[in-house]
Amino acid sequence: MHIREYQQWLEEWDKERTWDKVLASHTLLHALEELGEVSKLIQIIEGYRAGEGVTPTQLQDDLALELSDLQVMLFKIAYLCGIDMETAMIRGQHKADARFPDPTTGPATRQSYWQHFRAYLAERGLEADPPA
């Protein structure tokens, strides 16, 4: 299925249930709720938050479903606002290629990120590397 086909399917599916009448601003609230669920799962996967009794496979499956739920809300906001996501995503690819045309600059950009991050922590008296 192509991106445009998915968006058209979603709009028709919503229309059959009259969910196409929900305001984009309210759909955004639902998207933020889904984003929170994605955030919680990533925190568990990365070890920042405890995940009692959940296997890595279950976490990955749950994350896939929550990402799908978030995608639904984003595609819904797009169709409610008259935006074709396939076109928008192609434009986004062109924007990224124009902004970062040379893939070899990735390591330098990443190194700069870490330098800024460590400086931020040092300015606040926080440790860059937690004690072992």
Located regions from the model:
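Flexible "arm" and connector segments at domain edges
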Residues: 1-67, 71-132
